[in-house]
């Protein structure tokens, strides 16, 4: 009976330990992975789909303008001196509209709509948006550079057009309220009868219809972000839903129905990466993340830097920069020719935004050192100006993100235009923006409850089952071999020592299995 009971204990214990191993290390991870595949795909009525369609909280949107403190000297060829003004803080609410699912190829199409709300109390000290900013006249310089590059024979006519439209300006700078250049709009006076300004305004209306607001009396209003505010974007984006393969979720496959761009060379025209609002799960440190930026007409590939923590959740920290187009083979195709690549850290956006602009990291971080020599007042700092993203790797959830970019323009020297003939010819900063995400306690708690608490519970259970099973199995074995173990133990402790009378010394004697006979007494 004892034999059967001992074997039973050992078998039960081994079974419990085996179940703990199978459940904790094999079954549960497989179940979790399967469940995540379902939850992270853009299926209808899932929580992820709802959040993807309309993010239920505001993102940070900060704008920093550069105020030029020596415009008169710059007009004569001196290096600009700038002072950063900001941040101007806006809440950014993102949603997707006109959404359509396409079952046959597992894709979904949408247009995006962003809405901005100014929050002066979260902006820089004392900033109201009514501050006067002195900066290069973006619209005027864009006109001049575009004509200079594309139609140099019309430069004389352009000079007359600038004088007519901008009322005989004395320099290339504008003095505007911050909120005017950002959202409300700067007036462009096209109410002219002279041939040159009238012809220029006709061309402006035709080419700039998507970036200008046409007012009564032949006036135009130009702003950097005004037409993006609470306006449905004209571009139709097509992305993968990830139902058939969750690793494809959010991958951009077309813009306006086109499977690739037609403005760059080779693979630079490809849409690589997600739309930036969702990422695939099961990320490893070796994975090279990719997201496509429609505003910059290119993909970004952040790389893993270190492991860190966000509100108690372990995350992978990624960083990125603008790149070196001349020396990076992956980026060469953004240049018309290798000889025409912009300086390190700058990207020519002319083909993308239809305006002579350059993108860089704020304060020319990671750019050619000459850029900092040409402009005084910049102080690049990786923590303040770099692109940073923290991902929870299992679910692919961005926990914290700082997406930063600076927009720049060349102060091009043009001999045939009076106010441009002595400009220094430097690429100079206009403004930089930061789009920020930081999951609040509510959503972090949701992630913990849905993912990490179950994992911890299972982790405790699996180790408990394994430990209990091993102890039970060991106890069963000991119980089964108890008699043999006791016999071996007792035998190991018994000893018989021979007594030699010559020694004159009594030795300890232990005799097992013999009776003691009393000594005889001789009478």
Curated annotation (Swiss-Prot):
GO terms for MF: scavenger receptor activity
| Transmembrane portions of the chain | 11-31, 459-479
Q: Which GO terms describe its cellular component?
A: cytoplasm; plasma membrane
Q: Where in the cell is it found?
A: Cell membrane
Glyco sites are at 67, 229, 440
Q: Which residues lie on this side of the membrane: Extracellular?
A: 32-458
Question: Which cysteine residues pair off into disulfide bonds?
Answer: 268-333, 297-352, 335-341
Q: Which InterPro entries does UniProt cross-reference here?
A: CD36_fam
Renumbered residue ranges of the record's region Disordered = 499-523
Tissues expressed in: Localizes to both male and female antennae but not the leg, wing, gut, head, or thoracic ganglia. Detected throughout the sensory epithelium, associating with both sex-pheromone sensilla and plant-volatile sensilla. Differentially expressed both among different sensilla and different neurons within a given sensillum. Expression coincides with that of several other olfactory-specific proteins that are involved in odor detection.
| Annotated keywords | Cell membrane, Disulfide bond, Glycoprotein, Membrane, Olfaction, Receptor, Sensory transduction, Transmembrane, Transmembrane helix
Q: Which residues lie on this side of the membrane: Cytoplasmic?
A: 1-10, 480-523
Location (main, coarse): membrane
Q: How does it sit in the membrane?
A: Multi-pass membrane protein
In terms of Pfam families, this protein maps to: CD36 (PF01130)
Positions in coiled-coil regions: none
Signal in keyword set: no
Query: A GO term (biological process) for this protein?
Result: sensory perception of smell
State the similarity comment: Belongs to the CD36 family.
Biological role? Plays an olfactory role that is not restricted to pheromone sensitivity.
Protein name from the UniProt record: Sensory neuron membrane protein 1
Give the organism the record lists.
Answer: Manduca sexta (Tobacco hawkmoth)
